[in-house]
Amino acid sequence: MKLAFLYAGQGTQHVGMGRDLYETYPAFREVLDSAPVDFDLKQLCFDGPEERLNDTRYTQPCMVAFAAGVTALLKDAGIVPDYAAGLSLGEYSALHCAGVLDAPTTISLVAFRGQAMADAVKDRPCGMAAVLNLDRDTLKQVCEEASHAGVVECTNFNCPGQIVISGDAAAVDRAGELAKAAGAKRVLPLKVSGPFHTSLMAPAGDALREKFQSVPFCEMEIPVLFNCLGDLKGERDTIPDLLEQQVQSSVYLEDTIRRLAELGVDTVVEIGPGRTLSGFVRKTAKQIKCYPVETAEDLEAAIAALKGA
């Protein structure tokens, strides 16, 4: 068996996430209780309100704390991956898994990232939408045609048949209309609060570059595949540049999954609320087995299956 941990990004968070893990496992509880944030993280995860949980300033530390807690539980059970990767925000969780950042530093860093991303488009109506069943080249052309209404770009190449577009709200709406006219099956607005991975995030990239100067990045203990490459990168010194680039450029998750398959990965543990990434894996490399871990029951089932493999 060759194993990868794949970490969820924003959009799958929901009120109640992590409650049973918190009640069941002291190691998970410790991560959430010690999160270095200026709000009650566990209360927001468990009880909401949903509107606040969906605000990127709060979504990011909540998601990463959840992921760090699950990672600790898996490693405590002797489950250590051969590779790690994540979707967007999940890349920070992958770096934590790989030993590059400890849990408090990772949570604090993504809280800063969330604020920087919110500040980058403050008072600017923006959005993201998933476009189904339209190829990359056609959708890129659609975005170019819609750009008279504002910034709109292809930002997440998730799997065959699903690409996310982001940008100014009017331009995203126009691109959605053009995409449907070009043959897209559906256009689905996403539950996020900003035009992530577009050029509109350049100010956030600048803020992160400055922030990274005081962040202690360690060597990777586990190889990480990076979003903006869809591939491995081994040098510690390149990590800040890749993370700065990531916030304002496209995420190549489909390419990442294909690369994992090329590397011989046959099993993936999806860490985060929901089962979205497992769906992307099945559509991209159906030979890979997926074990989504969101609940205590999921965790127990995954550990039993992986230890028996």
Where does each model-flagged region fall?
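Short, flexible loop segments at boundaries between secondary-structure elements
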Residues: L229, K289-A309
